[in-house]
From Swiss-Prot:
Its main location: nucleus. The modification Phosphoserine is found at residues 2, 17, 50, 52, 55, 74, 115, 135, 153, 177, 192, 268-269. Component of the inner kinetochore constitutive centromere-associated network (CCAN) (also known as central kinetochore CTF19 complex in yeast), which is composed of at least AME1, CHL4, CNN1, CTF3, CTF19, IML3, MCM16, MCM21, MCM22, MHF1, MHF2, MIF2, NKP1, NKP2, OKP1 and WIP1. Interacts (via N-terminus) with the outer kinetochore NDC80 complex subunits SPC24 (via C-terminus) and SPC25 (via C-terminus); the interaction is direct and contributes to the correct spatiotemporal organization of the KMN network. Interacts with outer kinetochore MIS12 complex subunit NNF1. Induction: Levels are constant throughout the cell cycle (at protein level). The modification Phosphothreonine is found at residues 14, 21, 42, 53, 86, 88, 91, 129, 134, 139, 174, 191. It comes from Saccharomyces cerevisiae (strain ATCC 204508 / S288c) (Baker's yeast). Residues 111-121 have a biased composition (Basic and acidic residues). This is Inner kinetochore subunit CNN1. Component of the kinetochore, a multiprotein complex that assembles on centromeric DNA and attaches chromosomes to spindle microtubules, mediating chromosome segregation and sister chromatid segregation during meiosis and mitosis. Component of the inner kinetochore constitutive centromere-associated network (CCAN), which serves as a structural platform for outer kinetochore assembly. Modulates outer kinetochore KMN network activity by regulating interactions within the network.
Length: 361
């Protein structure tokens, strides 16, 4: 390698050294080749360097040159934006470091400001004007301290639990003469225990008429011709009152055991299905479909079961498979024998399914 030589110059104190070395010459040659490649691949840039006309005159001549110039411009702007992103990231990192350092030193300053604000609040209790604080933290801590001093204790009255006073009207309702016990039919006596099982630990909203069963319960017979007229009159009165009740009293009717026995009193010749039996028959279907029926709905289903019981009473001993299927089809419950089997599978437990399958299918 040749010895580096310094180019002759008039000013020896120039900042830029002009010592020519092989490495410097090689770098200059590479830069020149890169510039040539750039000019060769960008006709718009080459046109700007070679032509002496103005830029807007060049752009107005050829649309291809305008397009290439815009592409070059977009590339330059993209590179510049990337450079700006790196600078912004560095700036954000620097700001984050400054914030962390400020937060580390902040607790000590807050303690000093808090002690200073406490002293200022103690000195300015009698003054109506608030002191001028130098920072936002002083103002916040001063207000918090003043608010803590203004807390008040609230007095709570004691709770006294007392018994509900009983009136003489309720005592009068529980006393009945022996003659009243004779007016209770056997159907009501049979249906009342099942309804009572459905309403365990649920006090009625309305005051139901208590049914007192005295020692004369044993000699009661099923046929009481002297009381048939009274029972029909009571049934008609209960039906009339049930139809005239508003929506607000539906919950009271559902909790009233006397009102739930309307099907048994109205059609005493046919014994309806008990609510417990209905729940047992429909338990599987209701659990699979997650259906919860209210009490009033069960009483309605019990009333509708009288139609089926009446039909079975008329056809008892002579009921055939086809007649049963036809009757269910006429009611609109099923369409064919397969639907009846599916209905029995949904509503009946496994033991009853096997029994009805051996009889019908």
């Amino acid at each position: 390698m040749s010895t580096p030589r310094k180019a002759a110059g008039n000013n020896e104190n120039t900042e830029v050294s002009e010592i020519r070395t092989p490495f410097r010459e090689r770098a200059l040659e590479e830069q020149r080749l890169k510039d040539e490649v750039l000019i060769r691949n960008t006709p718009g840039y080459r046109k700007l360097l070679s032509a002496s006309t103005k830029s807007h005159d060049i752009l107005n001549k050829d649309p291809n040159e305008v397009r290439s110039f815009l592409q070059d411009l977009s590339q330059v702007l993209a590179r510049k934006s990337q450079g700006n992103d790196t600078t912004t990231n560095k700036t954000q990192a620097r700001n984050l470091i400054d914030e962390l350092a400020y937060e580390e030193s902040q607790p000590e300053e807050n303690e000093l400001l808090r002690s200073r604000s406490e002293k200022l609040t103690d000195n300015n209790i009698g003054n109506e004007t608030q002191p001028d604080y130098t920072s936002l933290s002083q103002t916040v801590f001063a207000k918090l301290q003043e608010r803590d001093k203004g807390l008040k204790s609230r007095k709570i009255d004691p709770i006294i639990i007392q018994d509900v006073p009983t009136t003489g009207h309720e005592d009068e309702l529980t006393v009945h003469s022996p003659d009243k016990a004779n007016s209770i039919s056997m159907e009501v006596l049979r249906t009342s225990p099942s309804i009572g099982m459905d309403q365990v630990d649920e006090p009625p909203v309305r005051d139901p008429v208590p049914i007192s069963i005295t020692q004369q319960e044993e000699p009661l017979s099923e046929d009481l011709p002297s009381d048939d007229k009274e029972e029909t009159e009571e049934a008609e009165n209960e039906d009339y009152s049930f139809e005239n009740t508003s929506d607000e009293n539906l919950d009271d009717i559902g909790n009233d055991p006397i009102r739930l026995n309307v099907p048994a009193v109205r059609r005493s010749s046919i014994k309806p299905l008990q609510i417990m039996d209905l729940k047992h028959l429909t338990r599987q279907f209701l659990n699979e479909n997650r259906i919860i029926l209210p009490k009033q709905t069960w009483s309605t289903i019990q009333e509708e079961s009288l139609n089926i019981m009446d039909f079975l009473k008329q056809k008892i001993g002579t009921l055939q498979k086809q007649e049963l299927v036809d009757s269910f089809i006429d009611m609109g419950i099923i369409n064919n024998v397969d639907d009846m089997f599916e209905l029995a599978h949904e509503l009946l437990p496994l033991e009853l399914q096997s029994r009805i399958e051996s009889y019908l299918f």
